[in-house]
Amino acid sequence: MSCYDLVERLNGTFRQIEQHLAALTDNLQQHSLLIARVFSLPQVTKEAEHAPLDTIEVTQHLGKEAETLALRHYRHLFIQQQSENRSSKAAVRLPGVLCYQVDNATQADLENQVQRINQLKTTFGQMVTVESGLPSAARFEWVHRYLPGLITLNAYRTLTLINNPATIRFGWANKHIIKNLSRDEVLSQLKKSLSSTRSVPPWTREQWQFKLEREYQDIAALPQQARLKIKRPVKVQPIARIWYKGQQKQVQHACPTPIIALINTDNGAGVPDIGGLENYDADNIQHRFKPQAQPMRLIIPRLHLYVAD
């Protein structure tokens, strides 16, 4: 497919996302709002976009105010829609839930609307990350050439719709991206980096090459069967735990965007019990269960690469 055709599809798909989101928010406002609770988080400034988040202060919003914030959030796709001081790289998150009363017909209609939006968002993301054939570093410039100011994460981010929950509880999740590697796989990656002539700020080309050579030597000195692991921290994420009484099961969802909960009164469903979201404090995290971790030693800090002792 030509670049021109891909750009045409990219723009066309994005316009459909905008149109369907507008239709969804209009449709939701035609339904009876049973309960709404969302939690705004402090805006991340450009200066602090890479800083670790040790504390997050939460502000709760209820009822129609919460609904207004949520519906606006679903359509927040461009940096022009936010403060000039706010980071365009840090995700804009608004955990919470909107609960609407539906019957069988309106439930099916809303489910189809959300499913269509999520399909379009997934297709859009595939165009940018796969069909473009571009490395991650080049995608930002490519997308913004055709959609200036787009917040790509907000465009990719799908909506979560649930039916007839009994309880909804909110919390925080600390996660890591973990990938197990062999010694030879790491050596292969470092060899590719060594063959490149580029430098990485703040190092000069010579300093960067020297750093890579030292890393290569450190890995090459390990036994071939050494167990290596990348353990990269991900910024703390708001989550929602949903309990379904009839099925007697709990489901956990990432909750960067307000969940849409449909309460089908035709089936006798009632208003769910909704909890709050506490402020986040990294120094006071309570783990329900934390298994004993295998002793690991950090060997290449920039890659978050560890070796088992």
From Swiss-Prot:
Lineage, top ranks: Bacteria, Pseudomonadati, Pseudomonadota, Gammaproteobacteria, Enterobacterales
- A single GO CC term, please? cytoplasm
Alphabetically, the GO molecular function entries are: DNA binding
* Species whose genome carries this gene: Salmonella arizonae (strain ATCC BAA-731 / CDC346-86 / RSK2980)
- Origin, by domain of life? Bacteria
The record ties this protein, via InterPro entries, to: DNA_replication_term_site-bd, Tus_dom1, Tus_sf
**What protein family is recorded?**
Belongs to the Tus family.
Recorded hits in HAMAP family, A to Z, give:
Rep_term_Tus
Q: What is this protein called?
A: DNA replication terminus site-binding protein
Major subcellular location class: cytoplasm
Role, per record: Trans-acting protein required for termination of DNA replication. Binds to DNA replication terminator sequences (terA to terF) to prevent the passage of replication forks. The termination efficiency will be affected by the affinity of this protein for the terminator sequence.
Alphabetically sorted, this entry's keywords are: Cytoplasm, DNA replication, DNA-binding
For biological process, the GO terms are: DNA replication termination
Subcellular localization: Cytoplasm
